[in-house]
Regions:
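Residue-level signal for beta-strand positions within conserved beta-sheet cores that form or flank
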Residues: 83, 119, 155
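Conserved catalytic-core motifs of GNAT/GCN5-like acyltransferases
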Residues: 122-126, 137-158
Length: 164
C-alpha cells in the first residue's frame, strides 16, 4: 500500500531520496528538458514555485511502499486560482512505475486538496513525454491550454480535472 509523507529540505535523507528518484529515471528529465538530472533538480523540487506564490503555499511529499520512498510530488495551493491546487510534479522511480502507484498517489493528492477546500486540480504536462500525457488523460485530466517555455523541449499543455 502506498503511503504519503511530507518531506523537508532540511532532511538529508529526504534530499537524498528525491535525488535518487531523479537519478533512477533519467529519461524523464531527458524527455522534458533535454538534459540529464542533477542536484539542481532537487533544489527546484523543494524551492521552485510560480512567481507571486509564497513558500508556505508549496508542499512536497514522498510516496512510500513500506520504508522505501518510490516517488515524490509537489503541490502548490491556490494556484493558478484560489479554488485550484497545482501539481508541479508527480514522479516515480522507473522500477516502480506501471504498478498503480501514480493512480494511488493522485488519489491521495486529490483527497488532500479536497480537504484543503479546492475544487480543481491543474498541472502542466510536456508534449515530449507521451507516457505522462497518456497517464494524465487516463486519470480524467483534459487539456485547457497550450503554451511554450524555453526550459522545456516540447509544448507545455496545461491540464485540469475537477476534484471529486
Amino acid at each position: 500500500m502506498l503511503a504519503i509523507r511530507p518531506l523537508t529540505n532540511e532532511s538529508h535523507d529526504d534530499r537524498a531520496n528525491v535525488l535518487r528518484i531523479f537519478l533512477e529515471s533519467p529519461w524523464y528529465i531527458q524527455l522534458v528538458e533535454g538534459r540529464s538530472p542533477s542536484a539542481e533538480d532537487v533544489e527546484d523540487f523543494f524551492y521552485g514555485k510560480p512567481d507571486g506564490k509564497d513558500a508556505a503555499d508549496k508542499s512536497v511529499f514522498g510516496f512510500y511502499v513500506g520504508s522505501e520512498m518510490v516517488g515524490c510530488a509537489d503541490v502548490i495551493r491556490a494556484y493558478p486560482t484560489d479554488d485550484c491546487a497545482w501539481i508541479g510534479l508527480l514522479f516515480f522511480a522507473e522500477a516502480c512505475q506501471r504498478r498503480g502507484h501514480g493512480t494511488s498517489a493522485l488519489a491521495l493528492i486529490n483527497a488532500m486538496a479536497l480537504e484543503w477546500g479546492y475544487r480543481r486540480l491543474q498541472l502542466a504536462a510536456i508534449s515530449t513525454n507521451p507516457g505522462g500525457m497518456a497517464f494524465w488523460r487516463h486519470e480524467g485530466f483534459e487539456d485547457i491550454r497550450r503554451t511554450t517555455n524555453h526550459r522545456f523541449t516540447g509544448e507545455v499543455i496545461v491540464m485540469e480535472r475537477p476534484i471529486t
